[in-house]
Every structure is written in C-alpha cells, then in structure tokens.
C-alpha cells in the first residue's frame, strides 16, 4: 500500500508540473524584440510596403524586419509565411512574379539575419488579395506589400 501511495504521489506531481509547463511561444509572448512586443509584430508591424514595380526593402522597414528576425531566432519552432502582393496594374502573370520577388526579398533579409530557412516560406498572391479596394494611388500604395503571417 505504501508503494502504491508513493507511485500515485509521484505520478500526481509529474502531472501537475506538466500542466504548469508552457510552450516556447507562450514564454515569448511577454518579451520585446527590437522594441516591439510579439503581439505588435504579429498584428500591427507585419507589413512591408514597396514602391511601384519595386521589390527592394526600404530603410524604414529595416528596424521592423530586424525585430521579426530577433523573434524568429529566439523561437526556432515559430514559422512565418511571407505573402507577396501587388496592386492591380500589370498582367496577372507579371503581378504573381512581382509578388513572389517581394516575398523572397523579405525572406532573404530574414535569412541574412540568421533566421533558419525552414522557418520562412513564401507565397505570392499578386493582385488577388488587395488590402484596399480602389483605383487610385492611395489604394495602390497599400496593396504593394509583403505581409508576415504567423
């Protein structure tokens, strides 16, 4: 009977400790990366905008992408999909290719900052998923983007 009590006590302790454990993602939730919280990176600062027919990353996005790189390096189990998008000008085929170049530019930037290739995948939606509907420069500028989707 004493042996059974000890076994049950040990098993119960292990179960309680296992229930208290948290995942790596949970542990990073309160941390800051480059001055940004994980929630901000995933919801507010997850978009890089591009100029017309461009796919180079402008300086204003370096700090944000550095923060994403720091987060991804600190949480190697985390994965992100970089979604490349364009405005409606150009042929669908051209826009798919341009959206892919935008997504690849972000992926290569993150890779250069030490993020593992398996953590980042890319997809191009071209003009198919506009952030803003409209046929003017204000709408177009919001649609020329790459989104980091966690």
From Swiss-Prot:
Keyword Cell cycle set for record: yes
Subcellular localization, as worded in the UniProt entry: Cell outer membrane
CDD domains in alphabetical order: OmpA_C-like (cd07185)
Lipidation (N-palmitoyl cysteine): 20
OmpA-like domain mapped to chain residues: 37-150
Cross-referenced Gene3D superfamilies: OmpA-like domain
GO BP field: cell division
Membrane topology reported for the UniProt record: Lipid-anchor
Pfam families referenced in this protein's UniProt entry, alphabetically: OmpA
Signal peptide: 1-19
Lipidation residue positions, type S-diacylglycerol cysteine: 20
Top-level taxon in the UniProt lineage: Bacteria
Keyword Magnesium among UniProt keywords: no
Principal location: membrane
A GO term from the CC aspect: cell outer membrane
UniProt KW keywords: Cell cycle, Cell division, Cell outer membrane, Lipoprotein, Membrane, Palmitate, Signal
Record's function text: Part of the Tol-Pal system, which plays a role in outer membrane invagination during cell division and is important for maintaining outer membrane integrity.
HAMAP family, A to Z: Pal
Family designation: Belongs to the Pal lipoprotein family.
Subunit-structure text: The Tol-Pal system is composed of five core proteins: the inner membrane proteins TolA, TolQ and TolR, the periplasmic protein TolB and the outer membrane protein Pal. They form a network linking the inner and outer membranes and the peptidoglycan layer.
Protein name, per record: Peptidoglycan-associated lipoprotein
The organism of origin for this protein: Pasteurella multocida (strain Pm70)
Upper lineage: Bacteria, Pseudomonadati, Pseudomonadota, Gammaproteobacteria, Pasteurellales
Gene: pal
